[in-house]
A protein has these predicted regions:
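Conserved alpha/beta enzyme-core scaffold
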Residues: 1-198
Length: 198
């Protein structure tokens, strides 16, 4: 919801020739097709594409190839300066009036704000979109107030029930659950797992 909402406003404001660097793009991002046709978006960096947007891009909708990267690869692109973020629009379930935010309080809980934290650290401007303003200080904060330039209250940032759509999903498969448990055990026992870990 956040990407579509932001891009609709940006298009109405007349911006063109933008690079979109969204973590992943799925069925719900079909409205981006029209923004690409209108020249609002001309380049895309993402970890995955699905649905009508992917179909149209596969047919040559974009003049430039989409830059597909891993999750860790995106962090490297941003931190190395290869991918410069002029404005990061970060959808969070809740924050306080100064922008202190995490991903696990509020109605639209989304989990870790790992990508958003990297964007907040490296973007020239950070716009926080939230559906719930909580009392100051909202903590623990994954993104802190000194990283946020503007806060916009919106009706809805996303649908927590659909956070597992696309490539991410819940499983009941015993083998997959064993792999997940083993991975969690490695993280917990790595020596890096502590309060505030993301």
């Amino acid at each position: 919801l956040t990407v579509n909402m932001v891009m609709d406003v940006i298009a109405k404001m007349g911006f063109k020739n933008l690079t979109l660097a969204s973590s992943s793009l799925s069925d719900c991002h079909a409205p981006l097709v029209e923004h690409i046709r209108q020249g609002v978006v001309t380049r895309i960096y993402t970890s995955g594409l699905r649905g009508p947007l992917a179909e149209e891009i596969s047919r040559g909708l974009l003049a430039e190839p989409v830059q597909i990267h891993s999750h860790g690869g995106r962090v490297h692109l941003v931190q190395s300066g290869e991918l410069n973020i002029d404005v990061a629009f970060l959808g969070v379930p809740s924050c306080d009036e100064f922008g202190n935010a995490n991903g696990y309080t509020g109605k639209a809980c989304c989990g870790s704000l790992g990508y958003a934290m990297v964007d907040a650290d490296n973007a020239k401007q950070v716009v926080m979109l939230t559906e719930e303003l909580l009392p100051y200080p909202h903590n623990p904060a994954s993104i802190e107030q000194d990283q946020v330039d503007l806060i916009v209250k919106v009706d809805r940032v996303g649908d927590a029930a659909k956070i597992g759509a696309g490539a991410t999903r819940m499983t009941t498969n015993p083998r997959e659950l064993l792999i997940a448990r083993s991975a969690a055990d490695v993280i917990v026992n790595s020596g890096y797992f502590k309060e505030g870990f993301s």
